[in-house]
């Protein structure tokens, strides 16, 4: 048939993990997210965020896109469920509720020279982390009434900055890149 055979794919993945251990951590989070519903049914905690942080050009976005987002959105020509700092909280929240056992990516939260813009990004980050990690449901307006929805997806964030509040940071699995990843071009 067409495409890669399983042996070639597994060998390629193991080789990538040997070259780039960060890739193994990212892919492991993706597998954890894929089993989220099963783990939740078993009563195990499933609410966490993979938070990939590092300076510009180290390969954060490519790492997340290559090892965490397994599907593409052919209309947008981006990984499926991929959002950036300009996205609305409502759109990200809806994806977190609807994309069961899939990764939702909040990509490229970077510093801004405009203080109000950076404050807006930090507020978005805070709200998204809390929505992705609260076990309880969160509200959404539907017409004149509030509808309670719960997070069903895993959240991956790529950023140049850490969350502001310690309570947000403790909800994250932190993957700090302190060097440029091999075979990763800056995006």
What is each PLM-predicted segment?
Residues 1-82:
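P-loop NTPase catalytic core of nucleic-acid-dependent motor ATPases
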Residues 28, 47, 81-92, 139, ...:
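Ser/Thr/Asn(+Pro)-rich, low-complexity disordered segments
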Residues 53, 58, 62-118:
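AAA+/P-loop NTPase substrate/partner-engagement loops
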Residues 94-99, 121-122, 146-151, 164-168:
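Conserved catalytic network of the ASCE P-loop NTPase/AAA+ motor domain
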Residues 102-129, 160-170:
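Conserved AAA+/SF3 P-loop NTPase catalytic/coupling segment centered on the Walker-B
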Residues 105-107, 131, 138, 149-160, ...:
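Structural recognition of the conserved hydrophobic beta-strand(s) that form the central parallel beta-sheet
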Residues 119-146:
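Conserved catalytic/switch belt of AAA+ P-loop NTPases
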Residues 149-151, 167-187:
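Phosphate-sensing "switch" segment of ASCE/P-loop ATPases
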């Amino acid at each position: 048939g067409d495409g890669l055979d399983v042996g070639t794919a597994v060998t390629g993945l193991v080789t990538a993990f040997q070259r780039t251990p960060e890739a193994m951590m990212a892919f492991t989070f993706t597998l954890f997210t894929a089993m989220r519903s099963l783990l939740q049914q078993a009563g195990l905690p499933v609410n966490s965020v993979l938070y990939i942080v590092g300076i510009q050009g180290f390969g954060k976005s490519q790492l997340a896109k290559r090892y965490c987002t397994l599907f593409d959105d052919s209309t947008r020509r981006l990984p499926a469920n991929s959002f950036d700092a300009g996205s609305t909280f409502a759109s990200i929240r809806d994806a977190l509720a609807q994309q069961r056992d899939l990764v939702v990516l909040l990509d490229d939260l970077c510093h801004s020279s405009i203080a109000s813009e950076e404050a807006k990004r930090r507020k978005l980050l805070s709200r998204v982390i809390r929505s992705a990690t609260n076990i309880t449901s969160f509200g959404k307006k539907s017409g004149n009434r509030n509808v309670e929805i719960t997070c069903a997806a895993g959240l991956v964030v790529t950023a140049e900055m850490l969350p502001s509040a310690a309570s947000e940071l403790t909800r994250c699995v932190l993957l700090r890149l302190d060097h440029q990843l091999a075979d990763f071009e800056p995006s």
